[in-house]
Amino acid sequence: VDAHNLQEADDAIQENTKAIYLETLGNPNSDIPDIDAISAIAKKHGLPVVVDNTFGTPYLFRPIEHGADIVVHSATKFIGGHGTSLGGVIVDGGTYDWAKSGRYPWISEPNPSYHGVKFTEAAGPAAFVTYIRAILLRDTGATISPFNAFLLLQGTETLSLRIDRHNENT
């Protein structure tokens, strides 16, 4: 779906649509979608908005302030800054009601693998990120080594300096 054609985006939503996913700077054209308008469409349909802010970086753009519910980043690129470590970031804005729509039983219904917990009741606005921590990380074992964590931390500490230099050079 062309993110610049808001009517097309609205028309593409079906009963089985789970979320609206977009990038702050689209790959490969670096196009910039109207996140506020797309978020309004998603809210009209009761859908969460997931924004990949890898190229926007948290230093330059904060999608949650523009209606995103979840923001993801590839930490390998600008956050790490050196391409030395693989990593990712998930930010849950706590703005979406996961129980209301009935589309996400894995969060809103009892989870038998986690003592019957309903993440929407146990974690409230943090239900999604709590599910990620409790279930997804448990099941996939996704974790980074201490050295890679150190490298990503170094990149984070210099993010503002590097992005300011990028901006000066544009």
Model-derived segments and spans:
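Conserved PLP-enzyme active-site core in the AAT-like
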Residues: 1-170
